[in-house]
Design a protein with these regions (language model features):
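Cytosolic-side transmembrane-helix boundaries in multi-pass membrane proteins
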Residues: 183-190, 194-197, 268-321
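Alpha-helical transmembrane segments within multi-pass membrane transporters and channels
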Residues: 62-109, 257, 262
Length: 321
């Protein structure tokens, strides 16, 4: 069944937006604790290469191999995030400088590229990859078929994660505590909340989400390893958190919007529809988002206007009692 351009773009936008959504949810949790993580892009690339390496090396069933790959990607992302957490929480280094340094260290010209070459992963298709969960008969349904039933399991898990993160931040004691840590760490400390522990935990969880986001590229969207495969998606994810006003449900909307933009250009080309240099604009989007992010996070007045956590990007020094 041939679907309309709009349906195909939306369905592809959901798929392409899924890694953005995972990365944005992880960044949101870290920022809610007051930690700005500009190393998302590097963590995504480490997750991408380690997830792909795992699925190539684990000789098991498809489900077991993919589950192991996602687990390894999450751990790899969390380990890179641990470096960031140690630098900015324990050593109180600049969160902007640390994040940028980690992106360079682990990014397309750094550790992820070295690992990809050392493991000889380039130009090898994935032994296993995520496919659509529902049968093709469901996917042929008008409109909802490709959009809802034509997705892989990572898409459906991401929906559950949006609900879980939203409920966690608004309906649970630890979630309310982390919001207190991000808004007023001194007051949270006075109430007996361990500020450092909350910041460490949520930074590591954010890194794990970024690792899964990276593995989504190599195991679902483009089942192979290519240097810089994320293409600046980490920067878009950081911008998403800001534009979503630190709300998980709006991160979902924004992720799918940017995913649809990414899907639009190839679909237009496939249908021989020319609307100007859309590909050039799409390729420049990550760099534009980098500029936007750095401008927004550098101005305290802008952060307050957007509703950012009051202590975002600020180290906490506990007063002697």
């Amino acid at each position: 069944m041939n679907h309309s351009l709009a349906v195909v773009v939306i369905a592809s936008g959901v798929a392409y937006g899924t890694p953005l959504l995972y990365a944005a949810l992880g960044e949101l949790l870290a920022e809610r604790s007051g930690v700005l993580n500009l190393g998302v892009e590097g963590m995504m690339l480490i997750g991408a290469v380690m997830g792909f390496w795992t699925v190539q090396r684990v000789h098991a069933s498809t489900g077991a191999s993919l589950a192991a790959a996602i687990g390894v990607a999450a751990v790899a992302g969390a380990l890179i995030a641990l470096i960031h957490a140690f630098l900015v929480i324990t050593l109180r280094a600049s969160q902007i400088v640390s994040g940028l340094a980690l992106t360079i260290f682990a990014g397309a010209a750094g550790l992820s590229s070295y690992l990809g070459n050392d493991f000889n992963l380039a130009q090898n298709p994935a032994r296993h990859q995520f496919h659509a969960v529902f049968p093709s008969s469901f996917q042929r349904w008008p409109i909802v078929g490709p959009i809802v039933f034509g997705q892989n399991v990572l898409v459906y898990v991401s929906w559950a994660c949006v609900v879980a993160v939203s409920l966690y931040l608004t309906r649970t004691r630890p979630g309310l505590n982390v919001r207190a840590v991000g808004d007023s760490p001194a007051a949270a400390d006075a109430m007996g909340i361990d500020v450092a522990a909350y910041r460490y935990a949520h930074t590591l969880v954010g890194g794990a989400f970024a690792g899964v986001a990276g593995a989504t590229f190599t195991l679902a969207i483009t089942p192979q390893w290519v240097d810089g495969i994320t293409g600046g998606a980490g920067w878009i994810a950081i911008a998403l958190v800001i534009f979503a006003f630190w709300r998980p449900e709006l991160c979902l909307v924004g992720a799918y919007f940017f995913g649809a933009l990414q899907a639009l250009s190839p679909e237009l080309q496939a249908r021989e529809i020319h609307l100007g240099p859309t590909e050039l604009w799409a390729n420049s989007l990550p760099y534009l988002m980098t500029i936007v992010v750095l401008v927004l996070v550098s101005a305290s007045s802008t952060r307050r206007w957007l509703g950012a956590p009051a202590a975002l990007g600020l180290p906490y020094v506990r007063e002697e009692r």
